[in-house]
């Protein structure tokens, strides 16, 4: 296994246009960490993974795996194993032959090949499927074979490029568990790309949040940290809105009172909200944006909250264990997630409490103010 270091890495597909895809990417990935690259389409997450694999050139900057600079090292010599979105199995070969193939090309002896393949099959639960061809396997089984083909190479770093996106919802959940167990079994360095932030939150030791690069931006690496760090303390509105499901609600307003650990915001709706936020770097009258997660909102009859607002119900979804209510709050979409059924119908007015400890606040440049408390819903 190995650590991975990226220093001032940049990617530009067309230097004549002076438009970078990735800029000033600086990351240090520890040996054995599970790192997830996440972001919307066009943010460069798969490009960054392919640069680590050696499938894309690095325009500027330095990539190290262990203590060796890899910029000009061919993919086959980088010590990485890659699993793609497509399974890419040989249809005329059975499971065992697919897993053996790469080792045979590298001229490993028969005993080594058999030992590695049998070990990978045991880890992945493929023992009973070794004589089957890909057409006789389910999607999840095919993906396990693709992972097994990488395991037998014993790479220093595993690279996963959206490996679950071709699977249905139930199978994605099952395979997430399998990949998490695999990481614990191998204690390996894994770099994993996904557009699904739920996958990122459930699998990662740390998450890299990337955004589509703005021309004037220094970098499109928005934040690098643990899942809970990104959830509770996002550095900006982009990260706050991307991490968490359903997405965070945002409402515009202005600061009307600033204290050491709290502030008051008058929303454009006219409601005044108290937030446990240190806003002392701003001034009274500054325009801000309040953020509140759907799961932190509670109908006022269940919440003794001084801060509250109301909206008109557009849709109510009752799922048994939880409910989602979609409100129109002064023309803005607003989502409430509750742990039980909320007795409302389309067209009703619903008033919700906003706990001060649950508030996030962002300035006019969308940078987050420091939160001074963490909300614990009881």
Language-model-derived ranges and their functions:
Residues 1-6, 12-24, 73-74, 107:
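A short, flexible loop at the N-terminus of ABC-type nucleotide-binding domains that lies
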Residues 5, 28, 64, 351-353:
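ABC ATPase nucleotide-binding domain
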Residues 78-79, 85-236:
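ABC ATPase nucleotide-binding domains
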Residues 59-62, 112, 252:
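Conserved coupling/switch loops of ABC nucleotide-binding domains, chiefly the family-specific signature
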Residues 61-69:
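Conserved ABC transporter NBD signature motif
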Residues 53:
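Helix-to-loop junction immediately C-terminal to a conserved catalytic motif
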Residues 262-315, 333, 343-378:
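Glycine/charge-rich catalytic "coupling/switch" loops of P-loop NTPases
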Residues 38-40:
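The feature captures the beta-strand-to-loop junction immediately N-terminal to the Walker
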